[in-house]
Each structure stands twice: as C-alpha cells, then as structure tokens.
C-alpha cells in the first residue's frame, strides 16, 4: 500500500533554493518554502514506509543546506 508523508525541512540561513533542489527527487510531489519553525514542506509518496525512509535519508537529507528534517506519515483513522 502506498505511503504518503509530509517532510518538514529546516535549512541554513539563506538557503531558499533547497525547495528547488528537492523538487525533482523521485517521489516528491512538490516542495514549497514556508515561514515558521520549518523552512520547506515536501509532500512525498513511496511504495512502503521503508522506501519512504530510504528516500528521506539517502536523497532529501543529503541535499546541501538542509540541517534537519521531520517526516510526518499520513494515517487514515
């Protein structure tokens, strides 16, 4: 069953281009700059929670300028 999540990203000061850098990653559906405690929000989809974790760790977190991420999987209650 596919997994959807929102990845909240904190960046270094002056790194507004992070949203443009993560946008093309396979599984990322969009990337938007924010104000507040997070700098970028990234809705993402993957085939499984494990695939989602691999995408976040091996692709999103390795993007230059990212200092922290929080991944919030969507749940159906």
Where are these regions (language model features)?
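A compositional/biophysical signature of low hydrophobicity enriched in polar/charged and small residues
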Residues: 1-77
